[in-house]
Regions:
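A short beta-strand-to-loop transition that corresponds to the Sensor-1 phosphate-sensing loop
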Residues: 1, 106, 179-182, 234-237, ...
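Inter-lobe coupling linker of SF2 helicases/translocases
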Residues: 1-124
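Amphipathic alpha-helical transducer elements in NTP-driven molecular machines
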Residues: 3-6, 69, 212, 216, ...
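A short acidic (Asp/Glu
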Residues: 6-7, 186-191, 245-246
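A short beta-strand element within the Helicase C-terminal
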Residues: 8-11, 242-252
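Short, surface-exposed basic-aromatic patches at helix termini and helix-loop junctions that form
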Residues: 14-15, 193-198, 249
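Conserved Helicase C-terminal RecA-like lobe
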Residues: 52-63, 107-228
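Conserved two-lobed SF2 helicase motor
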Residues: 222-240
């Protein structure tokens, strides 16, 4: 794995043969054809072994709670001006951003609202632009969605505890939970720790805000038998290029 840059790939080839590439910025496939083989997963699946097992996908659905329905109705009815000097299309764009955050978690949507309100209040008063009141109304509705009202979270909690899912929280059955939003990650980290009565070191989180050293330590711990970690909650930083499969076969 590498970042796609010619120089990065050249550095890997030079580990195998320091004389293969004279100029990391200027080389051809003929320079390296003797030291690497390119294969895709589809090519390897036909080799006659069972190294690549078929993945099983299940789509889980949950019915929205009353407070979630109320918040979504407020969101749908919301009309954003965005900025006195900007176009309405930008208001629609930000509303799409809010919608994605809302479907991630109330916490993620509230964070997006707070960031927008901070920018607006640096330029306007509440009377200058109606967006401030509109966003405050939506924020108030979202604050009423408690963890108990957060239907997706409650469904996740039920799944992890269910006999059908059969998760025993053993060292060889660890779980990776992905989320795009940092606030959702933080919410899950704190709430799952409480609701599953997990110790602090049994649940970890990882995001792009962390240093490479800290990220690598978490990945290494996740793959060790003796490590107490059972759940890893991660942002997109862990979606590619990390080996998390040694002690885990479940992704959420």
């Amino acid at each position: 794995p590498h970042d796609g840059r010619r120089e990065s790939f050249a550095s890997l080839m030079n580990i195998l043969d320091p004389t293969a590439i004279a100029n990391p910025k200027d080389y051809t496939k003929d320079d390296i054809k003797g030291i690497f083989i390119r294969r895709f997963k589809k090519d390897l699946k036909n080799l006659g072994d069972s190294s690549f097992l078929e993945r099983k996908f299940e789509c889980e659905r949950s019915k929205a709670s009353k407070n979630e329905e109320i918040a979504f109705d407020v969101f749908v009815d919301m009309k954003l001006q965005m900025d006195i000097n900007k176009t309405r299309n930008q208001g629609r764009l930000f509303k799409t951003h809010l919608e994605k955050a809302l479907f991630s978690s109330p916490a993620a949507c509230i964070k997006s609202i707070e960031n927008r309100l901070k920018k607006l209040r640096n330029k306007y008063t509440d009377d200058d632009i109606k967006d401030i009141n509109e966003l405050e109304t939506l924020k108030d509705a979202l604050l009423k969605i408690t963890p108990h009202d957060f239907s997706k979270y409650q469904h996740l909690l039920h799944l992890l505890k269910s006999s059908e899912y059969n998760w025993k929280a053993q060292s060889d059955d660890r779980i990776v939970i992905f989320t795009e939003r940092i606030e959702t990650m933080n919410f899950l980290y704190e709430q799952l720790k409480k609701d599953l009565t997990l110790k602090n070191d049994a649940i970890q989180k990882m995001s792009g805000d962390m240093s490479d050293i800290d990220q690598q330590k978490i990945v290494e711990d996740f793959g060790r038998d003796e490590s107490p970690v059972r759940i890893l909650i991660a942002s997109d930083v862990a979606s590619e290029g990390l080996n998390l499969h040694y002690k885990s076969h479940r992704l959420i």
